[in-house]
Amino acid sequence: MKKLALALDVNDINQALEIVDEIQDKIIIKIGYNLFIKGGINFVKQIKDRGFDIFLDLKLHDIPNTVYNGVKAVSEIGVNYLTIHSLGGQEMIQQAVKAKEGTDLKILAVTILTSHDENYPKLLGSSLSVPDLAYRLADMAVSNGSDGIVCSSHEVKFLKEHIQKPFIAVVPGIRLTKEKTDDQTRIATPEEALRDGADIIVVGRPILKAEDRNKIIKEMLSVIEEL
């Protein structure tokens, strides 16, 4: 399993394709709903045809039948990973899992976004801490058939230690240093996330804004190999 995903968070389809064409190593490409809305299935296939695994980050969160139909449609276009939101509940997750039966699509349930801080559970009317809420959501998702979860590096070690069923842990908010420079509040370096149990790390701006993107990618792949 590839362990490095590039968050292709740009606004222009042509720019996105230029970046992908520049990349030498066949890593995972994460496509958010901005590019997916603009480029559609054809854009996904263009990336797929270049030899990359596709991580479609749509965070589906709707009534179970609607999510079932959405996942079914995604499963037919050769996507490797698709996100749903764990807050959608057990039945929604079960329907998402059912919809991709017979395919290689992996369902990843988002727990708590890395932009949220410790006040987030209170906004939901919960007295739980962020780690406890993340655990409740992750355990529920994995127990109902989700192949993996998306969580911050702050929770991944605890989740790996306490959720009994094996699962893929995807950790976004990866930065080259711990200095906070953007809207992500719960960040980690590649080394920290991987040591704590991340199976896939998602990196966006540190690669996209680099003068030499391939250099940064190779450095991260080297860290992955060492760990």
Swiss-Prot record:
UniProt keywords, alphabetically: Decarboxylase, Lyase, Pyrimidine biosynthesis
Annotated residues for binding of substrate: 9, 30, 57-66, 114, 175, 184, 204-205
Protein's job: Catalyzes the decarboxylation of orotidine 5'-monophosphate (OMP) to uridine 5'-monophosphate (UMP).
Ranges annotated as spanning the membrane: none
Subunit structure: Homodimer.
MF terms (GO), sorted A to Z: orotidine-5'-phosphate decarboxylase activity
Record: active site: 59
EC number: 4.1.1.23
Pfam family name, one: OMPdecase
Reactions listed under catalytic activity: orotidine 5'-phosphate + H(+) = UMP + CO2
Protein name, per record: Orotidine 5'-phosphate decarboxylase
GO biological process, one term: 'de novo' pyrimidine nucleobase biosynthetic process
Species per Swiss-Prot/TrEMBL record: Sulfurihydrogenibium sp. (strain YO3AOP1)
Keyword Lyase: yes
Family: Belongs to the OMP decarboxylase family. Type 1 subfamily.
Keyword Plastid assigned: no
Classification via NCBIfam families: PRK00230.1, pyrF
Gene3D superfamilies for the chain: Aldolase class I
GO CC annotations on file: cytosol
Pathway(s) per entry: Pyrimidine metabolism; UMP biosynthesis via de novo pathway; UMP from orotate: step 2/2
